[in-house]
Amino acid sequence: MKMLILAVSCLLAITGSLAADTCYNDVALDCGITSNSLALPRCNAVYGEYGSHGNVATELQAYAKLHLERSYDYLLSAAYFNNYQTNRAGFSKLFKKLSDEAWSKTIDIIKHVTKRGDKMNFDQHSTMKTERKNYTAENHELEALAKALDTQKELAERAFYIHREATRNSQHLHDPEIAQYLEEEFIEDHAEKIRTLAGHTSDLKKFITANNGHDLSLALYVFDEYLQKTV
């Protein structure tokens, strides 16, 4: 009975094919061999040389890992500003939001990796050279905003790097689907976040330097109240 079902499946697969390709060849090969199972190793979601040439596939996995790491970094800052000593609820809210967004992007990238027929590997590293130092959560308010701004620029520049790798327009490296995904889900979003954080950094600097810095505590308190209402 199993052999009959297998034979019918093979017949349907072969007669339903429009052209001979890798998946079709796997089906035809397995149907020509006496077996109780169909392996079909190339009947998957991989196409366009994704994962076979260049480093777009590995870079995308490394990008998911980077978002995960930055999500935890932001979460550490959120916890630091939420303790009883610092007591900056607005800053904590801002960093918690950044952490949640980075976490959400991590999940989204992993889903897209599997959508393209690949598996997520958290051991992948980017080939892009960076000079980033270890993240420190216990920064004062202006330093924390500056660090967040640098982090968002890091994520944006990594997206540019992957986009450039995906759009080389060569026989094996061109992947417009990945390029479109980055443009729609990351690049515009990064521009908005960078502009917002740059604005926060500039505004806080003006608060701090007003009146020659004599009202520092009041300036930080007022700005934290502002973040609580706007984030």
UniProtKB/Swiss-Prot annotation:
Q: Where is the signal peptide?
A: 1-19
* Locations listed in the record: Golgi apparatus; Secreted
Out of the domains of life, which is the source?
Eukaryota
Question: Which biological process annotations from GO are given for this protein?
Answer: intracellular iron ion homeostasis; iron ion transport
Kindly give the Pfam families that the UniProt entry links to this protein: Ferritin
Ferritin-like diiron domain residues? 50-208
GO CC term (a single one): Golgi apparatus
Quaternary state and partners of this protein? Oligomer of 12 light (L) chains and 12 heavy (H) chains; L and H chains are disulfide-linked. The functional molecule forms a roughly spherical shell with a diameter of 12 nm and contains a central cavity into which the insoluble ferric iron core is deposited.
Q: What name is this protein filed under?
A: Ferritin light chain
Record the organism: Trichoplusia ni (Cabbage looper)
